[in-house]
């Protein structure tokens, strides 16, 4: 009898362990409740804007989602309203950069069908249109490209405006050039930034803090994505020097964070609080999400390696919000089978995503409920609020 009780106890504990495993969320609390990458985040007139590549369309680099800008007043609650670049809505749209205010207009520099284009609008939420020529796209390219080249020439534009008003454009493979005053043409002198690490690089980040210019560049890719940096005390075009500890983000095996790559650095206006946004390997290929952690500096101005987490940084501003209602139970018409995510370069990157109903209301943007494939006509989900409370 005691053996039977012991066996039953072990069986129950095994089942409880299985249930617990099924509720594991390997993707934590992403910034946005969507699959986005290559984020450029900025604060404009007290509102946070997040321009990014929309992922999750299941065809790798062959396609992308439409141009969408997410907005938030507190950095926690995000929303969007349609597409901000109508003519580019059906194109392959990547890495739109920050919106730069100049000449009474807002400019962005997305990579569209493999080419960088300047686009312009009256407001940061658009609608944007090509800054020169007809506002239309055709392949292989439209002659309104930033670099005015028949060859793709570069991707992932990053715009920096120095204190004297001079604008610079950085792009993949360590390139930099001055932008002319019209903000849509590039100075003929193009430089390649010398860095100690020579691997393929994209997703540049550039900013200035306390008189020091920082150039961040990616190396590797997929689960092996990393960010390294060099710094200059002279100008945005160098000369640059590499600190002894030049890697600021890399895979954190203990926390299950793989390939922290193309993102941005931003800071709160009027403060010295800096933040590092990065994409994470996610669900393999172009099915990524974006996370944000604090960026900290040493006394000599060098950057400390980022303490990567998937917890988020919480609210960056206080705004009045609705009272949260506690949910007692959540159940649904069906649950999609778990998704096993296979690694690409790192065999230790083994993940399983579950789609249980409770994930719809857990407050984490990295989890979700999905109905079973055969339940696609009229799926439903119910949140039980429990007994009536006054």
Which stretches of residues belong to each language-model region?
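Bacterial Sec-dependent N-terminal signal peptides
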Residues: 1-23
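Conserved structural scaffold segments of CAZyme catalytic domains across common CAZy folds
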Residues: 21-29, 362, 375-377
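Disordered, acidic Ser/Thr/Pro-rich linker "stalks" and the adjacent N-terminal cap
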Residues: 314-389
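Beta-rich carbohydrate-recognition and catalytic domains
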Residues: 22-199, 208-255, 269-272, 279-319
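Signature of short aromatic-glycine-proline-rich micro-motifs recurring in repeat-based ectodomains
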Residues: 97-98, 259-265
